[in-house]
């Protein structure tokens, strides 16, 4: 969607949206693919903080319906572990409860846990995986807080410089981007 000569009308299509469009084109069945994977497209769209307009709005609406009425075992376990009631799922629940826990797997270097959570059909295994993602998210939050405190101590005093470059060899590479964003906002 970002190709200058592409002409695609929705410029804010997330990576999962592009993957969905590719799968739909390869199978020649957008409706079947969306019916099977609307929850995944919803999760990725909201997690990537895409505007909920156009196709993104359709993806999220259909995905939320799936999350409310027929969630995959892993997602159901993650909702339960995060304190979400299926019938009350909305974009905020996805963005502030589910997405950070799923993203924690990648940030903390253990992506297979999230992948298995998406794929498992065993509710007991799903619960164990959801608990692990929640544990990783708490660890990510702790590491983030530590790095943030260290980074703030390193900031120059006085007027804000045009650019700030901070580094520490021990900082976890999966979390420094979040800390950098927080510091840039301040």
Placement of each model-derived feature along the sequence:
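Short alpha-helices
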Residues: 1-46
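Hydrophobic helix-and-loop "lid/oligomerization" segment in the mid-to-C-terminal part
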Residues: 27-186
């Amino acid at each position: 969607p970002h190709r200058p000569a592409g002409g695609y009308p929705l410029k804010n299509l997330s990576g999962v949206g592009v993957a969905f469009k590719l799968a739909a084109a390869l199978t020649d069945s957008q409706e079947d693919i969306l019916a099977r994977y609307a929850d995944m497209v919803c999760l990725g769209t909201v997690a990537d903080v895409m505007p909920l307009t156009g196709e993104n709005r359709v993806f999220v609406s259909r995905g939320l319906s799936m999350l409310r009425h027929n969630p995959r075992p892993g997602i159901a376990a993650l909702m339960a572990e995060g304190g979400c009631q299926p019938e009350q799922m909305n974009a905020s629940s996805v963005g502030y409860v589910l997405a950070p826990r799923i993203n924690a797997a990648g940030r903390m270097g253990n992506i297979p846990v999230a992948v298995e959570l998406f794929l498992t059909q065993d509710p007991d295994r799903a619960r164990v995986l959801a608990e692990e993602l929640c544990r990783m998210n708490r660890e990510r939050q702790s590491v983030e807080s530590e790095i943030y405190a260290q980074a703030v101590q390193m900031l120059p005093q006085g007027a804000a410089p045009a650019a700030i470059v901070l580094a520490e060899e021990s900082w976890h590479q999966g979390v420094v981007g979040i800390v950098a964003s927080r510091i840039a906002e301040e």
